[in-house]
Amino acid sequence: MKLAYWMYAGPAHIGTLRVASSFKNVHAIMHAPLGDDYFNVMRSMLERERDFTPVTASIVDRHVLARGSQEKVVDNINRKDKEERPDLIVLTPTCTSSILQEDLQNFVDRASTTSNSDVILADVNHYRVNELQAADRTLEQVVRYYLEKARRQGTLDQSLTKEPSANIIGIFTLGFHNQHDCRELKRLLQDLNIKVNKVIPEGGSVKDLQSLPKAWFNLVPYREIGLMTAIYLEKNFGMPYVSITPMGIVDTAECIRQIQKHVNNLIPNKKVDYEPYIDQQTRFVSQAAWFSRSIDCQNLTGKKAVVFGDATHAASITRILAREMGIRVGCTGTYCKHDTEWFKEQVQGFCDEILTTDDHTEVGDMIARIEPSAIFGTQMERHIGKRLDIPCGVISSPVHIQNFPLGYRPFLGYEGTNQIADLIYNSFTLGMEDHLLEIFGGHDTKEVITKSLSTDTDLTWNYESQLELNKIPGFVRGKIKRNTEKFARQNNITTITVEIMYAAKEALSA
């Protein structure tokens, strides 16, 4: 546990609550002190849905600490069972309430005797895993619970559907453009004459989970959630899965070829060929292929970018930048430290350096050092970009409200390639745009940013030096500012004047 004002991945209970609130008619009870119960507010603010967040906080207060939690937790489970009549109630502690070392499984067993709903305790170690790992584990736990229950009751139907079909696993609440990606994946599968059997957890019912084995294969678009479930289904029900993220032209084609392989394995006498579809989509439907060869995109050749995000999006965007658009990636990184090996394997050869960290100050210092033309990252990298005057395109969670768009903005599939190409191209400052604005005035009244990125700096710019900095063209201003600050630190100078600026320039050119 650590104190931070920014976290890329939240605590474990947030992942569990995201999965529980994605299902229909599932209620989550969070055993937590006041302050840990911000999930309701966060989801209500960000997710553009009409329904209330199905999460109740069973507050740990002084009375609970004096008398124990059992009575309160069991009462809350029974009350929600009567009020909401959910199919499933998920009980989860938080990392704070886990300190009490209570036997919550005993509370669940006791509540199960009087509740009409199924009741389970989220099987997650709150000290060892983060939000994404907990979400992956909770989804697998819920799927396992209902499939084993159906197997015991003899109601499990494992006969495959007549036509090729797939389960889409890993679309869930507060995900980055997840709803749009889901629509695009459905459209992609429909074009391939593959029916969608189930989408979980988003909008799915736990009662329908016993139908999962009827699909021919599982599609897992994101590594962060769904992979454990797909591995469980493969091991216990022999269901193959495709885990190639269909992001960008090359990887979308590769994903479709994997789907073709699994479909042909099940119907060897009636093989399908998706190559004509891939060819048509790449040449005529996706605009990204010809755009990447156009004169507009060639303006970006040799420009340097930095990428940072979750493992799935950061790896995919890095490959798109380097392989499909000819942009040099100075550094690519992820905050998914648990997936470091896979990430390194995916981006090897596509970037100059790799960074795996969940400390935003390390990311900020790396960006300041590399001085890229554009950043592709999370909400935090957008803030860093604003402070350094570097444009930023948001490509990964965690994000704020502007990345839960009302319009159709998928990142996956062939329509996703168009969105990504737009995002990449529009993120770079074009030509002399900034400089012309400064020369001719216009309506751009922003002041020069003189704050340094590092939080421990004590450098200040006086008024005259700020005016002097303002005269420098925007496309080199950031570099000159950083070089001047570096010179000042080396010489133990705390206030930067015009004289210091010229001294720094002379020292650099010497």
From Swiss-Prot:
Entry's EC annotation: 1.3.7.7
Assigned keywords, A-Z: 4Fe-4S, ATP-binding, Chlorophyll biosynthesis, Chloroplast, Iron, Iron-sulfur, Metal-binding, Nucleotide-binding, Oxidoreductase, Photosynthesis, Plastid
Its job: Component of the dark-operative protochlorophyllide reductase (DPOR) that uses Mg-ATP and reduced ferredoxin to reduce ring D of protochlorophyllide (Pchlide) to form chlorophyllide a (Chlide). This reaction is light-independent. The NB-protein (ChlN-ChlB) is the catalytic component of the complex.
Co-factor requirement: [4Fe-4S] cluster
Cofactor descriptive note: Binds 1 [4Fe-4S] cluster per heterodimer. The cluster is bound at the heterodimer interface by residues from both subunits.
Taxonomic placement: Eukaryota, Viridiplantae, Streptophyta, Embryophyta, Bryophyta
Protein name: Light-independent protochlorophyllide reductase subunit B
Pfam families per UniProt: Oxidored_nitro, PCP_red
Localisation: Plastid, Chloroplast
Organism name: Physcomitrium patens
Family: Belongs to the ChlB/BchB/BchZ family.
Pathway stated in the Swiss-Prot or TrEMBL entry: Porphyrin-containing compound metabolism; chlorophyll biosynthesis (light-independent)
GO molecular function: 4 iron, 4 sulfur cluster binding; ATP binding; metal ion binding; oxidoreductase activity, acting on iron-sulfur proteins as donors; oxidoreductase activity, acting on the CH-CH group of donors, iron-sulfur protein as acceptor
Active site: D296
Quaternary structure, from the entry: Protochlorophyllide reductase is composed of three subunits; ChlL, ChlN and ChlB. Forms a heterotetramer of two ChlB and two ChlN subunits.
Major location (coarse): plastid
PANTHER family in UniProt: LIGHT-INDEPENDENT PROTOCHLOROPHYLLIDE REDUCTASE SUBUNIT B (PTHR33712:SF7)
GO CC annotation terms, alphabetical: chloroplast
HAMAP family according to UniProt: ChlB_BchB
The reaction(s) this protein catalyses: chlorophyllide a + oxidized 2[4Fe-4S]-[ferredoxin] + 2 ADP + 2 phosphate = protochlorophyllide a + reduced 2[4Fe-4S]-[ferredoxin] + 2 ATP + 2 H2O
Residues that, per the record, bind substrate: G431, M432
Example of a GO biological process term: photosynthesis, dark reaction
Positions contributing to [4Fe-4S] cluster binding: D36
Coiled coil start-end: none
